[in-house]
Amino acid sequence: MSNLINIKNRINVVTNTRKITNAMQLVSTSKLHRIINLTKNIKAYQNLVETTFDNIVSKITQEELNEIFPPKQETDATLYIIVTSDIGLCGSYNSNVINELKKVIKPSDLVITLGTKGLNWIRVSKFKDQLYKAYVNLEDKLDYSIATEIGNLNFELFAKNKISSCKIIYTKFVNNLIQEVSVKQLFPYDSSHLEIKKESEQMEGDIEFEPSAEIILQRAFPLYVSSMIYVLVSLSKVSELASRRVAMESATDNADEIINDLNLEYNSKRQSVITQEITEIVAGAQATN
């Protein structure tokens, strides 16, 4: 009888867990459907920002670009911005980002974390002294003011010779089932792809800049960095919801299988107990006769 009680308790525990995973799956699906409609607009905005900036950069030489943002000889430190979630139960979403950071981080680098999971990890890791700033309790859609603040921090650190570059590690949204960890350099601007664009005739025609491309670039670059942070973090949030939906769907399916197996085991043992009790009753009746 004690075995039956234990099995029944396990069924209740798994059933309660299934209710949680199923609820989180439904919530993630609802949020994903809502936010995925914004993805096209976000990607269109990203394409507009990148194309506009490419057009500006294409009008100046690499030497002029180096004069505006001179390469730092005093340090080779990189500021890494990592995008993680505030809550778990989203598969390997957070661990993939953290593992990517582990591959590339150097002792002189600095880290800005977005999301509670990234902060919790770095606080207990050997990289805890490299944490520069953390942002937690973010909404499904990043507040643009936070992106602007991070962009300004980047240029402050660069001006103080604390860093020579800035990169963001985020999760690229491919589709509902595929999300890929990516690293994008935000600063200095990587213009290596411009020649390829020119050869494929994707660049715009002649554009006149007033007062000059150099001055516009100098003023526009902080906007570019902030915009890219906003876009990439927003796309990461889509990936987070997709990862959580898949993880919770898998967990719910696994719970259903476990419940079915436990029910079969419970019914089998219960049948054995009943059969044994009937046998004992019959044997007792025969003994009295």
UniProtKB/Swiss-Prot annotation:
One of its GO terms (cellular component) is plasma membrane. Signal peptide: none annotated. The keyword Ion transport applies. Keywords: ATP synthesis, Cell membrane, CF(1), Hydrogen ion transport, Ion transport, Membrane, Transport. Its main location: membrane. It is found in: Cell membrane. GO terms for biological process: proton motive force-driven plasma membrane ATP synthesis. The keyword Transport applies. GO terms for molecular function: ATP binding; proton-transporting ATP synthase activity, rotational mechanism. Belongs to the ATPase gamma chain family. Produces ATP from ADP in the presence of a proton gradient across the membrane. The gamma chain is believed to be important in regulating ATPase activity and the flow of protons through the CF(0) complex. F-type ATPases have 2 components, CF(1) - the catalytic core - and CF(0) - the membrane proton channel. CF(1) has five subunits: alpha(3), beta(3), gamma(1), delta(1), epsilon(1). CF(0) has three main subunits: a, b and c. This is ATP synthase gamma chain. The lineage of its organism: Bacteria, Bacillati, Mycoplasmatota, Mycoplasmoidales, Metamycoplasmataceae.
